[in-house]
Curated annotation (Swiss-Prot):
Protein name: Tryptophan synthase beta chain
Subunit (UniProt): Tetramer of two alpha and two beta chains.
Transmembrane segments: none
Cofactor(s) for this UniProt protein: pyridoxal 5'-phosphate
EC number in record: 4.2.1.20
Keyword flag Lyase: yes
Keywords: Amino-acid biosynthesis, Aromatic amino acid biosynthesis, Lyase, Pyridoxal phosphate, Tryptophan biosynthesis
Signal peptide coordinates: none
Residue ranges of coiled coil: none
Amino acid sequence: MKNYHAPDEKGFFGEHGGLYVSETLIPALQELADAYKAAKNDPEFWAEFRCDLKHYVGRPSPVYHAARLSEHLGGAQIWLKREDLNHTGAHKVNNTIGQALLAKRMGKKRVIAETGAGQHGVASATVAARFGMTCDVYMGADDIQRQMPNVFRMKLLGANVVGVESGSRTLKDAMNEAMREWVARVDDTFYIIGTAAGPAPYPEMVRDFQCVIGNEAKAQMQEAIGRQPDVAVACVGGGSNAIGLFHPYIGEENVRLVGVEAGGLGVNTPDHAAPITSGAPIGVLHGFRSYLMQDENGQVLGTHSVSAGLDYPGIGPEHSHLHDIKRVEYTVAKDDEALEAFDLLCRFEGIIPALESSHAVAWAVKNAPKMGKDQVILVNLSGRGDKDINTVAKLKGIKL
């Protein structure tokens, strides 16, 4: 994998990705692609990006040896890449800082975003406040109900939260609505996509901004243990935290890469959000081609996950490509496994993880005991779980 290069000039990762949008959006995406290409080759752009990550986000985020959890499980040593310690509480802000700097460079005064768990909405509202832009966040009505703390947070930050009542009233529908709005106001509006999906150049751009995770982790693990981990694992919805960890490791052939999809109630039921593990066919959604949960007529299927942030029927195109070329293994953690991992991390390490990240922790919980004590698993702890305490309390029958 030493010579891995993707996407190609048309925005394809193998047979995934590309640009499947209405004519009206082509000029906007071309303008964005040109602006990003120029920014990518401008050292000053990256200097400003790094400066904000350091002084505003609080990077680098540490790697932490979860020694008590490792001892309890009795096997491999579990290390956590602590994205939960970033300003706003998750990895999302790495990307919103980058896109906001690009919006500023392009002279856009307004940003819009879609959000599922609310973390990307909060991160977008945060950077809009930071750079003096107006912000509208599109969010499915169901997600608004299960993520009230984040909805209030966005409003505190000055954003307008637009509830989406159409379809399944979740992330997919919020993304549809945001794209419609972008078509209508493309001149003054920048659309900050929150995951490594969407039409080109978004998957590449989001990956590049999130690669700070894996680049830091490589240097930090080398310093901490004198080598790289045996396995690097991350949860995958659209897949931005995972691609940020995986991409810098693609050339490290001794490092196994594992992406954990949302298994929901099981991939043998309709209630999950695991397109790759469930063997979903290729389809087109939100401007890109990738594995997509759909019925025999090509209608997008409903999804289920205990975590709002993984509740998405598609997956970023680069993940589909990495699956095709067998560089990354994709598997699932079910709701109950994620909840068990959530409890274990709380009790053994004093860290409340996001339910999304708990899916990656669940892989470590399941697999560490089968590995040697000298082996190392690096888990991307993509976010903190404050936003999820209502969901968890409800599932435990506790009224807050």
